[in-house]
Amino acid sequence: MSKSTAEIRQAFLDFFHSKGHQVVASSSLVPDNDPTLLFTNAGMNQFKDVFLGLDKRAYSRATTSQRCVRAGGKHNDLENVGYTARHHTFFEMLGNFSFGDYFKHDAISYAWELLTGENWFNLPKERLWVTVYETDDEAFDIWQQQIGVPAERIIRIGDNKGGAFASDNFWQMGDTGPCGPCTEIFYDHGDHIWGGPPGSPEEDGDRYIEIWNLVFMQFNRQSDGTMLPLPKPSVDTGMGLERIAAVLQHVNSNYEIDLFSKLIAAVAKVTGATDLDNKSLRVIADHIRSCAFLVSDGVTPSNEGRGYVLRRIIRRAVRHGNMLGAKDTFFYKLVAPLIEVMGPAADELKRQQSLVEQVLKTEEDQFARTLERGLTLLDEELANLQGDTLDGETAFRLYDTYGFPVDLTADVCRERGLKVDEAGFEQAMEAQRRRARESSGFGADYNSMIRVDGASQFSGYDHEQQQSTVTALFRDGQPVNEIHAGEEAVVVLDETPFYGESGGQVGDKGVLKAANADFEVSDTQKYGQAIGHQGKLSHGSLKVNDRVDAKIDTVRRNRIRLNHSATHLLHAALRQTLGEHVAQKGSLVNDKYLRFDFSHFEAMKPEQIRTVEDLVNQQIRRNLPVQTEVMALDDAKGKGAMALFGEKYDDNVRVLTMGDFSTELCGGTHASRTGDIGLFRILSESGTAAGIRRIEAVTGDGAIATLHQQNDLLQDVAHLVKGDSNNLTDKVRAVLDRTRALEKELQQLKDQQAAQESASLSSKAKMVNGVQLLVSQLDNVEAKMLRTMVDDLKNQLGSAIIVLATTADDKVSLIAGVTKDLTDRVKAGELIGNVAQQVGGKGGGRPDMAQAGGTDVSALPAALDSVEAWVASKL
């Protein structure tokens, strides 16, 4: 009996654990501290800094089963998913790693033992082929002489990608840095499947499938291309779990393994599909994996970055569900079956199941409203298409109006043997981006160009004033030795109490005083390891190496400290009230208020907002001590400290605790005790994106000020309704009831007036070619009453053409009515359009009723006079 996918995953980890490897949990799909990566796409991502020598671990051998996503960016498999046997947006990468421990011999021996050992995968040795880099004689000899693979099944692969060391069998992290040859292991499915061995003209067939890649990092590539040997060579291997499962379960497609078979059955059940070979089932089964795990790891659908890739995948899945005939939202219903088939690998997903389901359902609901209209428009465009390529402008219009990602449009075209002009689409997208930039009002940001060598020591945790030395000056983004009165600049100090903006906390303001100069600091920013003070020299001159007295605005800093501490209390209170799925997604802390963005799938109820506010104020009244401790990052996480999503942390981190209520990593400035905050009040709760909510709040004096404002407002209202705080609600309700009664009475009077006006007007109708025509300008009649009057006149006249007009505030309001027996000859929309054009306006409507407006009141009499001749020409 073949192993299940879950058993294969566990066997891999158990094997390497028996060889002295530390089993390390999968890292998030959102790369930790690596802005160069859109998503985690390989097992080595979480060890990148270890391989670069920037980080050290307590172990020198590791093994993982890493969740990976390849969709968007350089590694983008999206368009092939569902149409090939092995492409996925989400997959698991099994890997073993050596950090300066073992090298080629042990790496190859371990791989062979696991693949062919009787107690492990027990693959037939004669089915395995290997490739090595062309000049890697060491690896070739290990395979041939020590492992016993015949030379005819060991293939040397050279530089087959158009440059030196540009090869399928030479791995490099970038243009410089760690790199080295690799050896790949292939499985031969047999001659009943088309394809040739690697390096042959038929290598793209499905007979020989790569199952494992062993990378040997043995060189450090220099900027001039020189390859220097690394002092401690390392090993990084990767084997796709789904691929090895297909081999061990004796199937030729990843979509036939047990995991996908169960998921595909679940997709068929929720969509009502009966043909289990339909490619759309594969697409959806793949996409629920990437989407569910991305949401679980903190990504939410949006129109940029990672969120946009997630949105594209969800919408592609929904469109394929639509093709299968799904009548209702279905995608979110696949989270539960996914958790079941993934087993222990889905523990975190299971904890966040309700949040993930809600985010997916909300996005599906949102897209379903426009999917049908967008597909109809696309069908019309393709029906009229000349040639085999849809133009980029149309693809962009589908994206801009209906939220159709271009790859979804390409998907539809592909099914019909057509293509999309993706270059034209990108041109239209870039034109939109350019318009957005031009309308944003932002010019060049010279500060963003500043590059500072060296570092500044931050002393602001303990000091509000500091004697410092100027180490650098920048004017218009360029380094200078001296600045003069009236000039704006950035001043860098060797040591400073000024906090540089980070972690949501704004930078400090204050003053730098020199012997004969004052520099007013309006903001403080970080430039690498340096802290830059932005501002203006009010008088004198300031030079590099001058001594200054750096003093922050302490009143402002104190308000910021209170607001920052309140965000920590708020975060903890939200998690207690709404659930553990709540995670910080962004914040702004200044001296006036705090803004806190967090993950949650629906608007908070008023009682939940009150509960959170009360909980924070309880902690303020407890006057908890606010304490900080510096420790190793892993120790801090072990202590339960929350590491914030997307935040970059050093090896040693600052852990901030507030009694027993909150523990977070934070480098900001804070109150000494929670009681210093005084009072906390929530001003608003709103949504910023799917699955993201925002709270704005105030503390201390700001919170007290809002109480005064609300009290003053209540007093004003009480005075207006002649009441007091005890009976204010009853008084306001009485005023509203009376207002509604008067409005109803007024409407009745207006209806009576309209009926009377209509009765008097009907006698003014004249015959034009045997048809009654009534044209009239009315005074002191509201525009919205014209429609009622036209309906009344139609009933009174039986068969007629009517045009009514009124004016107010230098604007013309027009309406035309045509009884249904005459609409084959006179259309109300055409009639009103002719009149509106003469008074500087436009309008339209149905053949029997149309409205319009205009701006030229003086032209109205002549325009109405022209109606009779126009109508006569139509009769």
UniProtKB/Swiss-Prot annotation:
Organism, as annotated: Serratia proteamaculans (strain 568)
Record: residues binding Zn(2+): H564, H568, C666, H670
SMART domains cross-referenced by the UniProt entry: tRNA_SAD
Subunit and interaction comment: Homotetramer.
Protein name in UniProt: Alanine--tRNA ligase
Keywords in alphabetical order: Aminoacyl-tRNA synthetase, ATP-binding, Cytoplasm, Ligase, Metal-binding, Nucleotide-binding, Protein biosynthesis, RNA-binding, tRNA-binding, Zinc
CDD domains cross-referenced by the UniProt entry: AlaRS_core (cd00673)
Chief location: cytoplasm
GO biological process: alanyl-tRNA aminoacylation; negative regulation of DNA-templated transcription
Enzyme Commission code: 6.1.1.7
